[in-house]
Amino acid sequence: VWVTAVALIVTVASTRAEEPTRVSLSGEVRGASGAHTVRVALWSEAGFLEKPVEEVDFDAGRATRYTFLVPRGRWAISAYEDRNENGILDMGLFGPREPNGFWRQFRGRHKPHFDEVAMPVDHDIADANIVLR
């Protein structure tokens, strides 16, 4: 019995040691006009909507497929089309003035909370697509 228990513990420990420490999180941005820069940002809860963990810009007319390598956990991804090329998502009285979206769809008029747009990531994900609206 002891030998079996020790073998089981060693097997579980070695399996966990072989798991990758980072996973691939990728997708594409849809709904962009193709005439302006598209900015994609990866967010953790700690710096949500203040300081992205990573950002990727796509020039006008370029493919908008992105990939982030992240530790397992909860992540949010946002994107917007920078129509006036000023480097920020312009806000109006009733919300954003430029097409934008999140990986986890959000339709509120208020500034989203991390929990409203974050998704759990514990394995490679290839279809973290964002639709700009």
Residue ranges and their predicted role:
Residues 48-62:
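Short, acidic Ser/Thr/Gly-rich low-complexity loop/linker segments typical of extracellular
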Residues 32-48:
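Short, ordered, surface-exposed loop/turn motifs in non-cytosolic proteins
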Residues 2-11:
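Bacterial N-terminal signal peptides
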Residues 83-91:
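Acidic, glycine-anchored loop motifs typical of Ca2+
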